[in-house]
Amino acid sequence: MGPTAAGKSDLGIELALALGGEVVNADSMQLYRGMDIGTAKVPLEQRRGVPHHLLDVWDVTRAADVASFQADARRVIDGLLAVGRTPVLVGGSGLYLRAALDDLTFPGTDPAVRARWERELASRGAPALHGELARLAPRAAAAILPTNGRRIVRALEVVELTGTFEATLPEHRSVYDVVQIGIDRTDLDERIVERVERMWGAGFPDEVRRLAEMGLREGRTASRALGYAQLLAWFDGAMDSAEEAKQATITATRRFARRQRSWFRRDERIVWLDQPDVTQVLRLVGSL
């Protein structure tokens, strides 16, 4: 686990080979079918024969659902453990990793309630709905920016369905025996630039065009993914050039990496490395 562009995917494959394991994806955007270049999904021919689970399971029009991912991930993990294989979870989506590994439960959803609040969002705007949330659940409102319409709508939905909203996650409590390895690097900013340049060189704009024809704009989650959102903005005339979209992607990715660092650093169970060194990780696994 760790911020984007740190080298997690290659290390995951090395660990799976060394431990007799299989990779379980915990990157929320790699769940989406066809989102390959922009999410740095490892191509099949580079996986070195290691099975990868929970890649390409959702259409781009589907909204992200962490509770559904939790059920799928635990089914895969339990299945691997039952046959003596080691699950190697790889990803930078902190909530998804916690959902798979920790004792977390998630409130249900109601499409009708969600749709009603989304209509309210469209007509009244995020700040007005944030005021409504502050009246109903002040702690929840304090944890959500007034401009984050998606999170405000979800919080209002939960409050309506359950009568409450817990704004913070519970204490870290694993449901499996887990060794958590975090990868962070001092050269991360440079690696992000290199990754985005490779994405453009590999035909990323064409990938986004294809996905736009498949309904990417209608996908509440996929359309907001790093790079995809910026290219859609260029296609729709909100940016002047592909170069502007590229630079905006670099800026947004660096900002996202800082948020990832902040999230993961709160978890004292994670052992941090500054390089993806499989030998060092195997020593850590053997010592615990």
Curated annotation (Swiss-Prot):
Positions of the UniProt region annotated as Interaction with substrate tRNA: 27-30
Top-level taxon: Bacteria
Any Pfam family hit: IPPT
Annotated positions binding substrate: 4-9
HAMAP family attached to this UniProt entry: IPP_trans
Assembly mode: Monomer.
UniProt function note: Catalyzes the transfer of a dimethylallyl group onto the adenine at position 37 in tRNAs that read codons beginning with uridine, leading to the formation of N6-(dimethylallyl)adenosine (i(6)A).
The protein, known as: tRNA dimethylallyltransferase
Organism of origin: Frankia alni (strain DSM 45986 / CECT 9034 / ACN14a)
Gene name of the record: miaA
